[in-house]
Design a protein with these regions (language model features):
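Hydrophobic cores of alpha-helical transmembrane segments in multi-pass integral membrane proteins
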Residues: 3-116, 136-155, 168-181, 191-216, ...
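Short hydrophobic "helix-edge" motifs at membrane interfaces and signal-peptide entry regions
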Residues: 54-55, 121-123, 218-219
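Interhelical loops and loop-helix junctions of multi-pass membrane transporters/channels
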Residues: 116-129
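Membrane-interfacial segments
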Residues: 155-165, 219-224, 284
């Protein structure tokens, strides 16, 4: 591994995830188990890459753009694996792993340019920045999962109305269907419950993360009056999820409407990231 660049290392779990879907398409019980094993193998390799990087470089006041993207992919996978273990809903691995794979590919193409935060922030503020990044990424990962679950909910609800179960394939009487689709898999109540848990855990993390970001902005610019596009979009995203959480807790909002709110909120997050990394080269106000 020492003879490979960081970007090349990111491609190892990427190709494992892509390769795993070949076994899924075969639609055999034994191949489905291979698919799951490959997904977990990819996650283990992601984890090894992260901890090797941590051991070699650590957090010494320098962060590269490609590493942040890779770290985001790793956090998403941690969230999905934990939800799968807790809810026993393996189908979420099928739907969200492609997002992880895309992040790994973006990490490969992202510039290996280090952001020297040591020259910008004090040691205390560096710790705040690291915590800010971790909380935002975990919160965004939970919202990404809520986005996927919301899409599944909407499509499954529609399929129920026409008395069909949501499937990746339409063939009937296949052993793979018995293994994967029966049980509590696409139960609407379970989907709604997972959606709510993503919101309930993710919203406080995002709130604390945004508050830390505001503190860091004030520390950097010595003023709360400098407002950047990323902050406006972050606030808009926060308001969407704040309204959604309020409606769910105070008014018992559930089902399709809650799913639509989650989808809109996540699309705003995607817009926020686009503004940060592509439309504004000096994202967050520093190079």
């Amino acid at each position: 591994m020492i003879f490979m660049t960081a970007g090349e290392l990111y491609l190892i779990p990427f190709f494992i995830y892509v390769f795993s879907y070949m076994f899924l398409l075969l639609r055999k019980k034994r191949f489905y188990q291979v698919f799951i094993s490959l997904i977990y193998s990819g996650f283990i390799i992601q984890s090894l890459i992260f901890f090797i990087w941590l051991n070699l470089r650590g957090f010494k006041g320098m962060m590269s753009v490609d590493w942040i993207v890779f770290f985001n992919a790793w956090i998403i996978m941690i969230v999905v694996v934990l939800f799968n273990l807790f809810y026993k809903a393996k189908y979420i691995l099928i739907y969200i792993t492609p997002i992880v794979a895309i992040n790994l590919l973006l990490g490969f193409f992202a510039p290996h340019v280090y952001i020297n935060i040591k020259s910008i922030f004090s040691n205390f503020d560096q710790a705040i920045l690291l915590t800010h990044i971790i909380l935002i990424l975990i919160g965004d990962s939970l919202f990404a999962l809520a986005f996927i679950i919301s899409l599944i909910y909407i499509f499954q609800e529609r399929r129920i109305k026409i008395k069909k179960n949501l499937k990746l394939f339409d063939k009937k009487n296949h052993p793979f269907d018995e293994v994967f689709y029966q049980g509590k898999g696409y139960n609407l109540e379970l989907l709604d419950s997972m959606n709510y848990q993503c919101l309930k855990i993710g919203f406080p993390l995002i709130t604390i993360g945004i508050a830390m970001g505001i503190y860091l902005s004030n520390s950097l610019f010595k003023s709360f009056m400098i407002v950047k596009p990323i902050e406006i979009i972050s606030l808009a995203t926060w308001l969407i999820y704040a309204v959604l959480l309020h409606e769910r807790v105070a008014k018992g909002l559930r089902g399709k409407k809650a799913a639509v709110f989650s989808i809109v909120g996540f699309l705003l997050i995607i817009s926020s990231l686009s503004f940060s990394f592509y439309l504004f080269p000096e994202f967050h106000g520093f190079k």
